Amino acid sequence: MNETYTPPTILLVEEDDEVRPLLSQNLRNQGYHVVVALNEADAIERTKGGSFCPDLILLNQVGRSIQEYAVMGQRICKSAGIGNQTPIIVMAEQYGADMEGKDVQVDDTEYVTYLEDGQQLMNLLHRLCPVYSELSEI
């Protein structure tokens, strides 16, 4: 294979200073290129003018509704000129035991994950945005 492999890029929007470095490192350890944004304005600034096109947008819900975060993901896509095909995942902040461990597909490209553990998130990411080692196994 003569082509240079470029890992998928995840735009991580994470406001929590304690969670941000751990989550971004875990994503890198899984083979992803990670661009970290602190909030929506930072994400828009980083993607403005098509400076880069993430393969997936990952938002950690903090303090606002899941719907507000989904709309935030849509605004980031629109401002970056990213098509509607880019998956958006919102990691839910608070939820009941009945939702724990579930991944809910809201529409064609939007998902809400109610995490039971970190492996659940990685499984969803690998399904929506596989890394090279997974592609070579297909």
Please report, for each region that a protein language model flagged, where it lies by residue:
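Non-catalytic signal-transmission and effector/linker regions of two-component phosphorelay proteins
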Residues: 1-18, 77-85, 110-138
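Short beta-strand/turn micro-motifs composed of small residues
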Residues: 14, 59, 90-92
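Two-component/phosphorelay signaling modules centered on CheY-like receiver
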Residues: 17-36
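Acidic, metal-coordinating helix/loop segments flanking the phosphotransfer/catalytic sites
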Residues: 36-56
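Conserved phosphotransfer microenvironments
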Residues: 40, 54, 58-84, 99
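Alpha4 helix (beta4-alpha4-beta5 surface) of REC/receiver domains from two-component response regulators
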Residues: 67-71, 82-84, 90-119, 123
